[in-house]
Amino acid sequence: MICLLFWNCNKKKENKEVNILYIISEKDKKFLTHLQKQNIPPPLPEFYFHNQIIIDKNGDFYFYQKEAIPWHCIESETDTIPDFINLKPIEIIKIPNNSCVDFIKLNISNKAERQRQIIIASEKDTINNMNFNKILTFLNNSLSSKIDAFKIRRTTQEEDTVLKYKKNNEYYFSDSIKWDKTKIKFYK
């Protein structure tokens, strides 16, 4: 009995990590309100950087890169519809959930300056994921992460669709998809 008491006294305190909810729509609203109070116009919508990390509904992480993201003149501040980027299932890879920070260090942090930008896109508005919190902590320390810019947003219709085909291992042909033209822009 005495041994048990001493054993409990010597037990080291466990380092429990706190999981913080991240709600994309709330963060966006707070940011825009802050800009409005400062009389600063909102930034132009950016949907894609060179690197994209997707968090699916199950909390799993996926990654894809695009060399040439289409760039065109934004018609107005309310132009919030992403471009069709011709994403294919083969371009998306799964990242082990507990290795996301290491993945960023090995594959993004050491790239040329314009390639050290990341979009984190979530299928859900609320992100409740310990690994996401680790990524956010890492990215917020620009000296150690060497990431120039990052943005968190909801997934696009194209990302949702292509990821579904990837996960179900189904044949994908973008022309056969009935795209909602109010959610995606096609340029000819």
Annotate each predicted stretch with a short phrase.
Residues 11-188:
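Long, low-hydrophobicity, acidic/polar, solvent-exposed interaction domains
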Residues 5-8:
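C-terminal motif of bacterial Sec signal peptides marking the signal peptidase cleavage site
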